[in-house]
């Protein structure tokens, strides 16, 4: 049985997460899904110009895992560009220091490990969780986890 996938640390999220070839009819568009950590690997290596070891440290993974991630990312982008496919940035196994959730029941504050614990508190298992920050990042990526009404409701009980 293989080991569970370790979550990769991600610091950047694009404002746009879908890119389509210009002038191609919608019915003819096929897409390539680029994981969030694959985009982060390309950003660190190709834009920030960090070496492989620095990139791996920032993402909190091994150098070999980093190399596998960036190879996969570059292959997907090359396929999309050469075959006229759309690029959708979505999914993956990642975590971030940018956003934390707070459990209303036990008041635990924790980092989000996407997709794993977006809706459940890891401490008590409650579904009553809200964003702990009101950052622009949260509005785009937490997808409605900042539920003020739910928080106010729980205080009134």
UniProtKB/Swiss-Prot annotation:
SUPFAM superfamilies listed in its UniProt record: Sigma3 and sigma4 domains of RNA polymerase sigma factors
InterPro entries: RNA_pol_sigma_r3/r4-like, UPF0251
Superkingdom of source: Bacteria
UniProt record similarity statement: Belongs to the UPF0251 family.
HAMAP family in the cross-refs: UPF0251 (MF_00674)
Protein known as: UPF0251 protein CBO1373/CLC_1408
Native organism: Clostridium botulinum (strain Hall / ATCC 3502 / NCTC 13319 / Type A)
């Amino acid at each position: 049985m293989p080991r569970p996938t370790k979550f990769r640390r991600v610091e950047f999220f694009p404002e746009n997460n879908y890119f389509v070839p210009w002038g191609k009819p919608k019915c003819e568009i096929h897409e390539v899904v680029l994981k969030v950590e694959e985009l982060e690997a390309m950003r660190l290596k190709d834009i920030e110009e960090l070496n492989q070891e620095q990139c791996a440290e920032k993402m909190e993974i091994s150098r070999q895992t980093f190399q596998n991630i960036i190879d996969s990312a570059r292959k997907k982008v090359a396929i999309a560009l050469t075959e006229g496919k759309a690029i959708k940035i979505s999914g993956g196994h990642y975590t971030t220091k940018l956003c934390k959730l707070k459990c209303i029941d036990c008041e635990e504050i924790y980092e989000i490990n996407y997709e794993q614990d977006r809706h459940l508190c890891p401490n008590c298992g409650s579904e009553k969780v809200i964003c702990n920050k009101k950052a622009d990042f949260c509005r785009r990526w937490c997808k409605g986890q900042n539920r003020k009404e739910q928080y106010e409701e729980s205080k009134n009980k």
